[in-house]
Amino acid sequence: MGDRDAIDLALGALRFRDLSAAELDARLDARGIECAERHEVLETLARAGYVSDERLAHTRAAALAERGCGDALIRVDLEGRGVASELVGRALETLEAERVRAERVAARRGWSPATIRYLAARGFSEEALETFVARDADGAIG
């Protein structure tokens, strides 16, 4: 397959949403594109600004945080997409504090033990949930 065909496949995959370099590489591999050609296509698209793991990390982290996800869930999502841990860490640093995001979710859902479980399942850290556990111990939740 020619470089142009591989680039067209890659651009088609990027048509509706950002993909990490690893995700795009896997898609091209599944379509039978050889390793050297995939590498060349990924470099070309990165230079042109079509593929950026850093941009993906920041936009995806912000979107997940807006949807009420904690840092652990965001980290798992991004690393599962093949984004480097360093880029994930930088993206998480730009987000609003996890405790503030957890409090916003709790204000919307109500302060209850079920909300604490919900937040834990959504990847919020124990540190972010300490406020809620303290309220529960004081009898303020429930």
PLM features: residue spans?
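An alpha-helical, amphipathic repeat domain used for nucleic-acid recognition
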Residues: M1-G142
